[in-house]
Regions:
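Rossmann-like NAD(P)-binding element
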Residues: 40, 48-100
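Rossmann-fold dinucleotide-binding core
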Residues: 3, 96-130
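A short helix->loop->beta-strand "cap" motif at the edges of active sites that frequently abuts
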Residues: 24, 85-88, 111-113
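Hydrophobic residues in well-ordered beta-strands that form the structural core
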Residues: 29, 49, 92, 115-117
Length: 130
C-alpha cells in the first residue's frame, strides 16, 4: 500500500515518522517548506508533488492547519482529488469545519474515492508518542 502524507508541521511530521517506524515505507510526503520533507526523506520517505501523491497513492492523509488549506490542497486547481483513482481513501486529520468536510466528501464521491474525517488532538508530544 502506498501512502501519501501532506502537511508536515508540528503534528504531521511526527505522524509521518510514526508511519515509517510502523513499517509503512512506501510513503510519499509533501509540505510547503522543504526542510521537513528532507528530514523524512532521510528517514526513508519519498518527497513528492501533490499531483504525484494523488496519482500514485492508495491512501492520502492530510494534517493541515485549517479548512481553506485542506480545500485548496484537495479541490484547488490541480488539487490532489483530481488525480486520485477510484478505490483510494482520503484521511483528513486536520481540524476543519464540517461544511468543508462535506464539500470535499461530495467531490471525492464523484470520483469513487472514500473519505475519513479523523481530526487529531494532543499536540506534538502525543503525535511523537503515536
Amino acid at each position: 500500500m502506498k501512502i501519501g502524507f501532506i502537511g508536515l508541521g508540528i503534528m504531521g511530521k511526527p505522524m509521518a515518522k510514526n508511519l515509517l517506524k510502523a513499517g509503512y515505507t512506501d510513503l510519499l510526503v509533501n509540505n510547503r517548506s522543504q526542510a521537513p520533507v528532507q528530514e523524512l526523506e532521510a528517514a526513508g520517505a519519498t518527497g513528492a508533488t501533490q499531483q504525484e501523491i494523488g496519482e500514485q497513492c492508495d491512501v492520502v492523509i492530510t494534517m493541515l492547519p485549517n479548512s481553506p488549506q485542506v480545500k485548496e490542497v484537495m479541490l484547488g486547481e490541480n488539487g490532489v482529488a483530481s488525480h486520485m483513482k477510484p478505490g483510494a481513501v482520503f484521511i483528513d486529520c486536520s481540524s476543519i469545519n464540517p461544511v468543508a468536510s462535506k464539500e470535499i466528501y461530495a467531490e471525492l464521491q464523484k470520483k469513487g474515492v472514500e473519505m475519513l474525517d479523523a481530526p487529531v488532538s494532543g499536540g506534538e508530544p502525543k503525535a511523537i508518542d503515536g
